[in-house]
Amino acid sequence: MPRTEPRVELLAHTPEPLSLLYAAFRQCYHAGFVADMWPRLLSGEIEREKQGAFIASILESGHSSPIEHVSFTFAIEGVSRALTHQLVRHRIASFSQQSQRYVDGSHFDYVMPPAIARNAAAKARFEQFMEDVGSAYRDIKALLEQDGRTGSRANEDARFVLPQAAASKIVVTMNCRALVHFFEERCCMRAQWEIRAVADVMLGLCREVLPELFAHAGAKCERLGYCPEGERFTCGRYPLRQSMP
């Protein structure tokens, strides 16, 4: 059973994302019709810096719903089922995940936690267990096929032995408002190492496309300037709110 590492790629995003956000925000406060200013936005007549500054000023007031008009789509592979179960908890998103029913898991890839990889005895036990699971999957699938359950019908029952470590692939689409919330929760040190690493890569890709919105995105402490998690859960990177003057 081969060990694998995560890979995150940005497949697509809404075209002209900054101008679209600017138009959406402006329409809320503009008596005219923003479609009439759209050519000026695309031509650069309304400068990017001006658009970004206007959006930032409105976001500071707490009005953020217009950022839902822009979305990003990512392809993610080499992540565990444990991660994807955490990922799909973010319900304001769209997901298309690799099926363990239609994809044969006889030689599944797996993800190994770094803490296990650093411990020689734990690593050896983990690797042996992955081999044992793979062997059990193949044996059960073969027995089911002998009973006439072939293809996906055998896979769908044999998959019950696959572990949380089994690697998966998934396509994820989120709008910017959902992404900002996702980064607040999953870039935080309280998030598990695997999903935090994936979130950090996703944030970097978003910043390349739309720095005006994502430059200061990330864990909540990055925006607030203090840790809101309380004394029990703080990582110490930022002071606690109650300790600030």
UniProtKB/Swiss-Prot annotation:
Family recorded in the similarity comment: Belongs to the thymidylate synthase ThyX family.
GO MF annotation: an example: thymidylate synthase activity
UniProt key word tRNA processing: no
Species classification: Bacteria, Pseudomonadati, Thermodesulfobacteriota, Desulfovibrionia, Desulfovibrionales
Subunit structure comment from the entry: Homotetramer.
SUPFAM superfamilies, per database record: Thymidylate synthase-complementing protein Thy1
Motif annotated as ThyX motif, chain positions: 89-99
Domain ThyX: 6-220
Purpose: Catalyzes the reductive methylation of 2'-deoxyuridine-5'-monophosphate (dUMP) to 2'-deoxythymidine-5'-monophosphate (dTMP) while utilizing 5,10-methylenetetrahydrofolate (mTHF) as the methyl donor, and NADPH and FADH(2) as the reductant.
UniProt key word Ribonucleoprotein: no
Entry EC no(s): 2.1.1.148
Annotated dUMP binding sites: 86-89, 97-101, 159, 186
InterPro entries, alphabetized: Thymidylate_synthase_ThyX (IPR003669), Thymidylate_synthase_ThyX_sf (IPR036098)
Gene symbol of the encoding locus: thyX
Cofactor(s) recorded in Swiss-Prot or TrEMBL: FAD
Name listed for the protein in its UniProt record: Flavin-dependent thymidylate synthase
Reactions the enzyme catalyzes: dUMP + (6R)-5,10-methylene-5,6,7,8-tetrahydrofolate + NADPH + H(+) = dTMP + (6S)-5,6,7,8-tetrahydrofolate + NADP(+)
Catalytic residue positions: 186
Species annotation: Nitratidesulfovibrio vulgaris (strain ATCC 29579 / DSM 644 / CCUG 34227 / NCIMB 8303 / VKM B-1760 / Hildenborough) (Desulfovibrio vulgaris)
Cofactor note: Binds 4 FAD per tetramer. Each FAD binding site is formed by three monomers.
